[in-house]
Amino acid sequence: MGSISSPSLIIDLANAVSSAAKNLDTQLQSQGFPQPSFEADGPTYVVPKDAPKAAHEARVATAEAALKLFNLVSGPSELLPNMTASYHTIFALQWLHHFDVFSHIPLDGSLSYEKLATKANVPESLLKSVARMAMTSNILAEPTTGQVAHSANSAMFVKFPNMRDWASYMFTASIPTAAAMVQATEKWPGSVKKTETAYNIAFNHDLPFFDHLSQSPVMTKQFSGYMRSVTDGQGMDLSHLVNGFDWASLPDKSLIVDIGGSAGHASYALAAAYPHLRFEVQDLDTVVNGEKAAKEHEEAVSKHVIGTDNRVTFKAHNFFEAQPTKDATVYMLRMIIHDWPDAEAKTILGNLVPALESAKATLLIMDTVLPSPGSIPSVRERVIRTRDLTMRQVFNAKERGVDDWEAILRETDSRLTLKNLRQPEGSNMCLLTISLQDD
C-alpha cells in the first residue's frame, strides 16, 4: 500500500487564500461594508480605517497568502519579466497622469479611444498601447472593444486630489531619487551628510531636501498632497496616537509639548479627545507663523473641532537648540527622528534631557520600529522597508530597529531608558515611552 503524500506548498497556499478570503468576506458582510470591486464605483479602501481589528487582519491574511501563491507559481524564471511589466505599468501610469487622461473619462460611462485621444491631445495609437498596459493592473477598463472606462483604481485619481499630488511627487521626485541610489553610493560611500544623498544626485544640487523643496512651489504642493495621502491612510492615522498611550491618566492641565508638530494636527486630535490636557506645538518660525501656517492651523482646527478654549498654543523653536519649555508632563516627537542620521538624532534627543530632568517628564516617540526580517506579513513589511530606503535616499537617515533605538538613547545619555514599546493594531509606527532614570 503506497504512502499518502502530504499536500504540496501550492495546495497549502491555495487553501490559505481560500480560508482567508472567506473570512474577509464574512467580516465585510457582518459589518455591512461594500464588497471590493474593480468597477469605477468600487470602494477605495477594501476595509475602512475604523473597521474592527479582525477585518483588517483578514484582509492582510488574504493579500499575504495570495502574494505568496503568485510568487511561488511564477517561479524564478518569471522574476525579471514580472519586474519589467511592473516598471512599464508605472510609466504607463505616469504617461496617463501627465496628459491628464483620467479627467477626460466619465466616472459613470465610457468613450472611444478616438474621442479620448482628441480630448487629451495625444496620439490615438499610443494611447491604446499605454491604456491597455495599465489595464493589466486594473488601471482603466475596456468594457467593449474600443471604449475606455474607469476602474476603481483609475477613478481614485479623479476623486481624490491628494492622490494626484502623490502620483506627481512619485514621478517627479521619488522614482528619480531611487534610481540615483547606486550613483550616490559610488560617489559618497557611507556618507551620513544630508547633502550627499541620492536626492542630491537626482536633482544635481547641494542642498538638504527641505531647503531644495522650498524653492519649488510645484514640488512643495505635490509633497504636501503626498504627505496628506500617507497620513490619511489607516497605517498612519492619528487615532493610533490618540488611543495608543494612556493620556487619560495624566493629571488635569498637564502640558504636552509637540516638538516639530507642524500645523498641530496631532495636538488638535489629542485635544479633542482629552479636554483636560494642554498642548504646545513647536516648530520653526516659518512653520508656525505666516499665511500658510495660519491656513493649515485653520484646517487642523476644523478637522478636530475642539472649540476656542486655547488649549493648543504654538511656539517657534528649532529642535537643534535647547528645549525652552521646562514644565511639561510629556515631550512628544512624532515622525521626527527617522528623518535624521544618528549624530543629529542624538543632538535632538540631547536637547531634551535638561527639560526631562527638570520636569521629571516622559518622552514619547512615535516612529517606525523595523521588524525582524520575515516576522510580519510581507505585504506590511515591504511598506516599512520602502520607508527605510526612502529615508536613506533622501536624508542619509534610516528607520531603526529596537536595538538601534536603545543604542541611540544610551549614546545620547546613559539615563535615557526605553520603558515601553507598543505598536497599535493597524499602525505603521510604534509608541516608545522613555524616561530619564536616576544614576
UniProtKB/Swiss-Prot annotation:
The protein's enzyme class: transferase
Statement: the UniProt record of this protein carries the keyword Transport: no
Keywords linked to the UniProt accession: Methyltransferase, S-adenosyl-L-methionine, Transferase
Catalytic activity: norrubrofusarin + S-adenosyl-L-methionine = rubrofusarin + S-adenosyl-L-homocysteine + H(+)
UniProt-listed SUPFAM superfamilies: S-adenosyl-L-methionine-dependent methyltransferases, Winged helix' DNA-binding domain
Pfam families: Methyltransf_2 (PF00891)
Catalytic residue list: 338 (proton acceptor)
Binding annotation for S-adenosyl-L-methionine: 283
Function noted in UniProt: O-methyltransferase; part of the gene cluster that mediates the biosynthesis of aurofusarin, a red mycelium pigment which is acting as a mycotoxin. The first step is performed by the polyketide synthase which condenses one acetyl-CoA and 6 malonyl-CoA units to form the first intermediate, the cyclic heptaketide and yellow pigment YWA1. The C2 hydroxyl group in the pyrone ring of YWA1 is probably formed during ring closure by an aldol-type cyclization reaction.
Name of the protein in question: O-methyltransferase aurJ
Source organism of this protein record: Gibberella zeae (strain ATCC MYA-4620 / CBS 123657 / FGSC 9075 / NRRL 31084 / PH-1)
Lineage, highest ranks first: Eukaryota, Fungi, Dikarya, Ascomycota, Pezizomycotina
